[in-house]
């Protein structure tokens, strides 16, 4: 062909991207432009690269990620709303050689499951919690979430979140960073190529720490909900950068993985 005749065949036929093998070839129920699909891919890639395909258990609760088990070909356990950390704790304690993680939204982790979240982290359970923060209840129609920004409009606060009425937005990741059981707490995003690469590094770091028995890890992904926000995917990313990143500042909040856990 044209390229082969010019000695360029190998260059143009080289594979530069492929779908992770753990990603099932099925349509996703997520809205087009949503951040969930990208994060799913990163989780699948990290599990494959670690060679943990047959030794990983994910826990997905109620929320947009309720059907996560359809998309990643690993073992999954469904949990009641907010109870993913409790279920993950049990699985990890029974199977300490397994990589165990939860995949939760802001309503599940920071509202109905805040007790399970904070106590599992404070105990230092050897699990990773992946927290998708899009500041809204996406699955149920766009209601106010614990992480909804001050002034942000939702169907349950149509005039904007007012701290005098609705209280302040909850920064549960920052709160988690002060718990003695947490070893690695970070906030990332997946809105650019660079941020996607950084988020993947964070996921790998947390998973490896859990397998080494180094305590609890929490990875917040500041995400978009273009349907709930009533914006196009492009505009949603712009809004996130202009508003979410000011309140939920990206970066590592805690990293004590190089320190030994005190012996009793």
Functional labels for PLM-detected ranges:
Residues 62-138, 201-205:
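Thiamine diphosphate
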Residues 19-80:
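Active-site diphosphate/adenylate-binding microenvironment
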Residues 114-119, 139-153:
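Active-site-proximal loop->helix
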